[in-house]
Structure formats: structure tokens, C-alpha cells
Regions:
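Conserved PLP-binding catalytic core of the aspartate aminotransferase-like
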Residues: 281-293
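Active-site C-terminal subdomain of aminotransferase-like
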Residues: 14, 190-271, 285
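Conserved PLP-anchoring active-site segment centered on the Schiff-base-forming lysine
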Residues: 87-103
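Conserved N-terminal alpha-helix of the aminotransferase class I/II PLP-enzyme fold
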Residues: 32-78, 85, 99-100, 108
Length: 293
């Protein structure tokens, strides 16, 4: 019997995705090998990589001004990766501090440049998303964590700023439509919404790169991975394949509009019961901060 999983960690995957992923472990693409055994330089995997990127672009309506990357290291690696690639020591990044993940990103960013915490809900144990704050001019970018699984909060209004947004969307990527033009970088570990742990989706606006003065290690330079088509080093083949299957499923369900409606309906069922039943007590004090995820 399949369990219902309310964990803040890796989420369940559609049954059809699990079945196809299981078949590929035994033999992939009629090639006599498991997908766990094929070369990342093979035509079979090149086709997987191309389709996965194509689906990401189609579902999220991503233009060619953005690169789509499939990287290792998890979203936590992106906490410093983004700063290394975007922020010079004398420049400042703005942050919304809305939970443990944003706090970790702030810590890592301070290694490479200045940080301006625009607003924080830390003193109230992150039980809401801050609303009344100003974003000064001159920031290199503004970093947000779009959804906070631990605290049950989600950004429903993006910061008003001329600076590009950098967003950790690990736990709500492709759960709703977003104004992509506001974002310079979006990154997300796959295990919440897109597949198993092991691959991180990164969407980066290419014109933002190449502006830092520091020398970057090849493995930590977005431009190297863009040039290498996410194969500069051996990519996480199987997680990317399962991501492809999950993206196919999202497309079949009706894309982001359908996902958004489904999540709104699901969240309403839960919150209605929490509000109605005296045995439950919600931890998010501001209803507008409640997560749909």
C-alpha cells in the first residue's frame, strides 16, 4: 500500500514515472545495458539530456537568454556558487531571511561579498514572510527562498526591485507560474518536485556571467558548464533521466497552470481542516504566508 508522504524531505513520484524508471534500470533504450551503466557521452543519454532541457524550456517558457544546467552538489552548493559567479567583494547582495536555507545562503555569500538583509522573520521563528521592507538601489542581486518546507511559508509576492532575483526554489519549482523575467538565477534540488536527489536544476541568465574579478575553478564556473552542455564532468545520469520522466508527466497533466490549480486545491483541504479542527494548531501566523506546498 502506497503511503501518503507529508515529509519536508524527498517527495513521492508519480507511479508511471517509477515504473518507467524501474524498467530503465534493467535495460535502457533496448541497448543491452542498464541506464546505470551507459556512458554519459552515448547517443542515448545525449537524447535524454536534450529532451530534459527542451521540456524545462517548454514547461516554464524559458527563452534562449537563459541557460539550463543540470549540476551535481545539491542546492546547498548553489548558496556559494551564485555568489562566486555574480558578486565582487565590494558589491552587495540583498537577502530576504525567511528560514534556515536562506540563513545558510547568507552565511556562504558573506565569504565573497557584502550582504544586506532586507528583512527577516528569524525573531518569530520564521512564522511569516516579511512584508514591509524597502529594497535599496545598487544591489547586485536579491536572493529569496521561495518556499520554506520546515516552517510552512511561501513567497506569494516577489520583491520590487530593478536588481535581478536569485531564487532557491528547491521545494516549489514548477508548482506554479512565475514572472521569469524578474529572475537572474533559479536553482532547485530535484528531490522535492522533479525527481530523486542527485541533480540540481539551474536556470541562469547568461548576460549576468563574466562580471566577477576573481578566478573561478572550472567546476564552479557556470560558463564552463554552459559550454560543456552540463557534461563538463560526468553528470548524474539516472536522476536526470527520472527528471525527464517527471517533466513529461507534468506536461501531460497540463503544465504549470494545472500544477498550480492542483496545489491550491490540495492546500485548501489541509488548511480548512487545520482551521476547523481544535486539535490542530497552525504555526504560520500570517495566512498570506501559508505555503501551497
Amino acid at each position: 500500500m502506497k503511503k501518503i508522504n507529508f515529509s519536508a524531505g524527498p517527495a513521492i513520484l508519480p507511479t508511471s514515472v517509477l515504473e518507467q524508471a524501474s524498467d530503465a534500470v534493467r535495460e535502457f533504450d533496448n541497448g543491452g545495458l542498464s541506464i546505470l551503466e551507459i556512458s554519459h557521452r552515448s547517443k542515448s543519454f545525449s537524447n535524454v539530456l536534450a529532451e530534459t532541457e527542451s521540456l524545462v524550456r517548454e514547461i516554464a517558457e524559458i527563452g534562449e537568454e537563459y541557460a539550463v544546467l543540470f549540476l551535481s552538489g545539491g542546492a546547498s552548493t548553489q548558496f556559494f556558487y551564485t555568489a562566486m559567479n555574480l558578486l565582487n567583494p565590494e558589491e552587495t547582495a540583498g537577502f530576504l531571511d525567511t528560514g534556515s536555507w536562506s540563513a545558510k545562503a547568507i552565511k556562504e555569500t558573506k565569504l565573497f561579498g557584502k550582504v544586506n538583509v532586507l528583512a527577516s522573520s528569524k525573531e518569530s521563528n520564521y512564522n511569516h514572510i516579511p512584508k514591509d521592507y524597502n529594497v535599496p538601489e545598487g544591489l547586485k542581486y536579491v536572493h529569496v527562498t521561495s518556499n520554506n518546507t520546515i516552517f510552512g511559508t511561501q513567497l506569494h509576492n516577489w520583491p520590487e526591485t530593478s536588481a535581478p532575483l536569485v531564487a532557491d526554489m528547491s521545494s516549489d519549482i514548477f508548482s506554479r507560474r512565475i514572472p521569469l523575467e524578474k529572475f537572474g538565477i533559479i536553482y532547485a534540488g530535484a528531490q522535492k518536485n522533479l525527481g530523486p536527489a542527485g541533480v540540481t536544476l539551474v536556470i541562469v541568465r547568461k548576460d549576468l556571467l563574466g562580471t566577477v574579478e576573481r578566478a573561478l575553478p572550472s567546476m564552479l564556473d557556470y560558463r564552463v558548464h554552459i559550454k560543456g552542455g552540463s557534461t563538463y564532468n560526468t553528470p548524474p545520469v539516472y536522476p536526470i533521466y527520472v527528471m525527464m520522466l517527471t517533466l513529461r508527466w507534468i506536461k501531460e497533466q497540463g503544465g504549470l497552470e494545472a500544477m498550480e490549480k492542483h496545489n491550491e486545491k490540495k492546500a485548501k483541504l489541509l488548511y480548512d481542516e487545520i482551521d476547523r479542527n481544535p486539535k490542530f494548531k497552525g504555526t504560520v501566523t500570517d495566512e498570506e504566508s501559508r505555503s501551497l506546498m
